[in-house]
Amino acid sequence: MSKEKISGSEALMRSLEHEGVKTLFGYPGGAIMPVFDALYDHCDRLNHILVRHEQGAAHAAQGFARVSGEVGVCLVTSGPGATNTITGIADAMIDSTPIVVIAGQVGAGLLGTDAFQEVDLVGVTQPISKWSYQIRRAEDVAWAVARAFYIARSGRPGPVVLDFAKNAQVDMTDYEPVNVDFIRSYDPDPETDSTAVAEAVALINAAKRPLVLVGQGVELGNAQKELQNFVEKADIPCGCTLLGLSALPSNHRLNKGMLGMHGNLGPNVKTNECDVLIAVGMRFDDRVTGKLETYAKQAKIIHLDVDPSEIGKNVAVDVPVLGNCKRTLSLLTELIQPQKHEEWIASFKPYEEKEFNQVIEKEVFPKEGPINMGEVVNAVSEATHNEAILVTDVGQNQMMACRYFKFTKPRSIVTSGGMGTMGFCLPAAIGATFGRPDRTVCAFMGDGGLQMTMQELGTVMEQKSPVKIILMNNNYLGNVRQWQAMFFNRRYSFTPMMNPDYMQIASAYGIASRRVMSREELNDGIQEMLSTDGPFLLEVCVVEEGNVLPMTPPGSSVNYMLMEC
């Protein structure tokens, strides 16, 4: 019996369905038109979200992936359509987000001729993706898609790019589903060395002042429960990286807060006082380590990670434990002895009190003056019972949101960590509403970041995406202005912002909105936002020259934090 003959575009549709895809984000164009034509017959199974710019498609796919744990998919045309996704691909690579970008390409016979909208997408994206492949034949579609999804989701997740030549979209081919669960040259889950585990166990059992650094690898490996079991048995306090904040509930007695330049005082100071440092699924980013020459020199360092290239890359490691966090944490928990570190844990308290008295109380509970950003974040977090998904943009809004929003559920934070991409928030929040339609999605952004991808309000309007947008408007590029104030003698070079009327913009898109200008209106505005079905834009006019504190100045040791500026 002969196999069914279908086009390469139809093979793509069936392959996506075979991978379990139900939602994709994209924008049509000439070189991808046959694929969109095939998609027309699959709209009952594949929900395509039409964005307003291809960068938005990539970020929406990221938001979808981060909250759902599934692979995000975007579909774009060649040339500028493909290059518009580059920022999102790079962002997904450094933040280990599984997305598959499918881009149209000129026909194979035109490759290398500088044809209309031809770009060497494979060449451009190889350094910023896990795998980049050009499909030139229709018969390769099913195999390429299966391989792409396997690579994107396995091991340390990341972006994959498929460059789909137009002739391969229209040519006919035999089709049958393909499954890929092994690639000879690719080891996504390396075997854990039992000797390394034994060495780690010995160090943990002997430790008097241990500290765990919790990274996003815990979330990516679905190891939240294993982490909690481990730290509770070992009685070890934790500091969380920006992307690892929701891996352990914020109110857990062992969660001592955020690490990094604008993190909490306790875990940053204690990094340079602990005797055993256990890094779990984190990469010792420069914003976490500060000055490397003085970073945790007194400690024995244990590093748990699935990616061997991260171990020893930035910080010398005494005991490397290779493997996925779920398995390695389970192994350690089984083998360690129950511990009590009451005195060590109590030593965090003075730093918590100092930070509250000198920073948090003033930022979150001011008695007078303009509204503070931290005050807004705390109020929204409380109003959502700390159960919402937090999506942030980049800058002061990001740091304030991540400092003062509280988490009770895993996979609850979506932000641009390593790349620091302004404009990330709005499209990523749209993606998050499709990835977890059962949860409230709160998108915190500044006036600078919103205007970078503001056209995606059109997507919000069309899809009736129930994203709750909290625009903290200070009429500045706030983070750059803060650095100009602290390190450049208050020379505010091109950081003041002239803004449009956001209420009129929201109205033009048919999005409910409210502007809050006084503290007395804040809680009412938040309640109106949360009680409104569908999207809502809450503009809060915040203090113009507010600063994010504490702060480790660039080039300083991680335990040196400014409490005022």
What would you call each of these model-derived segments?
Residues 27-29, 48-59, 74-81, 136-137, ...:
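Active-site nucleophile and cofactor-binding loops and adjacent substrate-binding regions
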Residues 2-343, 383-386, 459, 466-469, ...:
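N-terminal alpha/beta PP-like core and its mobile active-site loop of ThDP/TPP-dependent enzymes
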